[in-house]
């Protein structure tokens, strides 16, 4: 009986560790056209921030970033998330944008803005032990 309990407990421990290690290889992405930074809907900006807080995605990709009034939209969202206890990283972009829960190790413009549309940005980060590249386009 003791041996059976010991084997069962050991098996349960291995299954638990395996399940936990499998989970660390997963990440979530939220892609969102924020329709002029949420300005087209009353309370739109706050709704954007609140949905990110609710969902807690690893990465957020935005379309229709405008940086109105010489602001940095993604930095503003990161600051609002920080006020709610979440840490996200970003870099300056125009037309589309990226947020990451994981520190960004590199970012680049793949396709620059032309006639107020059409950007593609790339960022790199590490999730667990895996280097990941995330792209956003509009």
Q: What spans do the regions from the language model cover?
A:
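Hydrophobic h-region of N-terminal signal peptides that target proteins for export
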Residues: 5, 10-20
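Generic structural signal for short, flexible, solvent-exposed coil/loop and linker residues
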Residues: 7, 23, 48-49, 88, ...
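Ser/Thr-centric signal marking residues that sit
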Residues: 9, 31, 136
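Short low-complexity stretches enriched in small and charged residues
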Residues: 12, 52, 56-57, 89-94
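Structured beta-strand-rich core segments of catalytic domains in phosphoester-bond hydrolases
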Residues: 41, 65-138
């Amino acid at each position: 009986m003791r041996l059976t309990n010991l084997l069962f407990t050991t098996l349960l421990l291995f299954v638990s560790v395996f399940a936990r290690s499998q989970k660390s290889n997963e990440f979530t992405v939220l892609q969102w056209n924020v329709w002029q930074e949420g300005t087209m809907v009353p309370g739109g900006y706050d709704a954007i921030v609140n949905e990110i807080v609710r969902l807690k995605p690893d990465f957020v990709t935005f379309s229709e970033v405008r940086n109105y009034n010489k602001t940095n939209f993604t930095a503003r969202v990161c600051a609002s998330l920080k006020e709610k206890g979440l840490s996200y990283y970003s870099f300056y972009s125009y037309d589309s944008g990226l947020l990451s829960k994981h520190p960004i190790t590199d970012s680049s413009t793949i396709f620059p803005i032309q006639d107020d549309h059409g950007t593609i940005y790339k960022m790199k980060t590490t999730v667990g032990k895996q280097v990941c590249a995330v792209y956003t386009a509009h």
